[in-house]
Amino acid sequence: QLTFSPDW
C-alpha cells in the first residue's frame, strides 16, 4: 500500500 501513512 503506497499511501500517506504517518508513523506516529
From Swiss-Prot:
The modification Pyrrolidone carboxylic acid is found at residue 1. In larvae, expressed in the ring gland but not in midgut, CNS, thoracic perisympathetic organs (tPSO) and abdominal perisympathetic organs (aPSO) (at protein level). In adults, expressed in corpora cardiaca and corpora allata but not in brain and thoracic-abdominal ganglion (at protein level). GO terms for biological process: neuropeptide signaling pathway. The modification Tryptophan amide is found at residue 8. One of its GO terms (cellular component) is extracellular region. Transmembrane segments: none annotated. Belongs to the AKH/HRTH/RPCH family. Probably causes a marked increase in hemolymph carbohydrate. This is Adipokinetic hormone.
